[in-house]
Amino acid sequence: MSKKLQNWAVPLIAVLLGMLIGAVLMLIFGYDPFWAYYDLFSTAFGSLKNIGEILRAMSPLILIALGFSVASKAGLFNIGLPGQALAGWTSAVWFALAFPELPKVVSIVCTVIIGLVAGGITGAVPGILRAYLGTSEVIVTIMMNYIILYVANNIVRFGFTADMLRSSEASNRISASASYQTDFLSSLTDGSRFNIGFFLAIVAVFLVWFMLKKT
């Protein structure tokens, strides 16, 4: 089997095996797997709104997967991506809430850059420790997930100003000028929350592919 064919076959076989195992488990517990999978796919792809919501949910997952792929290419196992993503999200949300009146383009560019920097810094810590002290990146990244989680929670509770908060533990919604949603994309997908984050993720896919394959 060629390498190219293997790259396509392995994920496909994994998905099919997962569905097969799921079907067996449903049969064991007395459920009909045919109707279960029918409902799954008809709900997911049965309307433009649902398709838009799927694409919206895919966007951060694509970016997180890209982060893993870069580390994996370097021979490292980065299991700290949830924490690194949370660091980026928290930083970007703080900026969006702190400067709600910025033009949309400026706000989006700034939040993307701030999220990249915050996630990059938290990802660099285990990398530096691995490079200079020989520590296991697996252990460090797992531990940092929890550190970042609690730090982010405290930033929301105590680091956000009163006008940024809806309650003691939740921020306000970001302004329309800072949102990645647009009226055009929302109307295109029947009112879903589909936004330009999906297109940013696709651009990131191309950039990472170019970096890994062409440089």
List PLM regions with ranges:
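Transmembrane helix-bundle core of multi-pass membrane transporters
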Residues: 141, 145-214
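Single transmembrane alpha-helix segments in multi-pass membrane proteins
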Residues: 25-29, 35, 45-98, 112, ...
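A cytosolic-side transmembrane-helix exit/cap motif
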Residues: 55, 102-105, 130-133, 157-167
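Transmembrane helix-bundle signature of multi-pass membrane transporters/permeases
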Residues: 4, 86, 90, 116, ...
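Short helix-capping/hinge motifs at transmembrane helix termini and TM-loop junctions
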Residues: 29-31, 99-101, 134, 156-160, ...
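Interfacial loop-to-helix junctions that mark the boundaries of transmembrane helices
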Residues: 5-10, 42-55, 80, 105-109, ...
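Interfacial/capping segments of alpha-helical transmembrane domains
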Residues: 23-44, 159-173
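N-terminal signal-anchor transmembrane alpha helix
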Residues: 7-28
